[in-house]
Amino acid sequence: MYKRQARTTRTYAAGLALMQFIWVVWALLGQPGGSGLLVALLLLEVFVPPLAERHGATPWHPEHMAERYSLMTIIVLGEVLLSTTGAISVILDEGTLSGQLIMTVIGGLLIVFCLWWFYFKHSHAQRLEEDGARPAFVWGYGHYLLYAAIAAVGAGLGVCIDVLEHVAHVSSRAATLSLGVPVAVALVLMGFLHARDVASWEWAVRAGGTAGAVLIVALAGWEPGLSVLLIGLVLVASLVLYLVGTDPSLAEQPHGPTDRLTSAEAPNG
């Protein structure tokens, strides 16, 4: 066991040291190759851990890893709220609040809260513990794309607000697509990150259907405020339908926990 782990750690050390050397040389040479070489070097570096783990998995803590990634997700979602509220505060200072802006704020809040719920609806720690280290790389690297998609949601909300304030000169369809596309991508990625058995793959399909509905709203070309609100309502509807369809207790316990009392436990008189 320890021999395998020793080989793994040596591969880690050699691979990461080599990549650091390449990064330094690339920087000293004036970053030749531009963005293309940058992406290639990034891919090489993220390939080092999977290559090293082929010799034997190092000890790791699934719950801790899930917590770290989850906290980063919350931070990115918080940045979306921060950017939106910052833009709205400027508008309030200028005294130009309108119905479209109010719908944008409400829709933006619904989108953020629903994305939070979609991400935390399953236990990531349980999946990591049951699947092992190798699938965890796919799960972990998949978060890179998820973080980018969530950050793009904040940018899309900013574009919609700028269009309503006549700061950004793009069409309503372009503005809502700048929001709808990253929301749809985030939904698909969350469905993929959760998918590990039949039940969760069903959820992944549901997430894909919700993403399709979001894109339809974005393509409709309505005013940005209305579109943002409708996208938020689409997510809420998907959430409610999921809860009603998968949680029988919502219908089976209309009178609270006292319905489960047996005759022996029921109070006399």
Per-region residue spans from a language model:
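Accessible peptide chain termini
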Residues: 1-3, 268-269
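Predominantly late transmembrane helices and immediately cytosolic-facing juxtamembrane segments
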Residues: 3-36, 43-215, 221, 235-260
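Hydrophobic alpha-helical transmembrane segments of integral membrane proteins
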Residues: 222-229
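Signature aromatic-anchored transmembrane alpha helix within multi-pass, membrane-resident enzymes
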Residues: 229-235
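Long, low-complexity, intrinsically disordered cytosolic termini of multi-pass membrane proteins
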Residues: 257-269
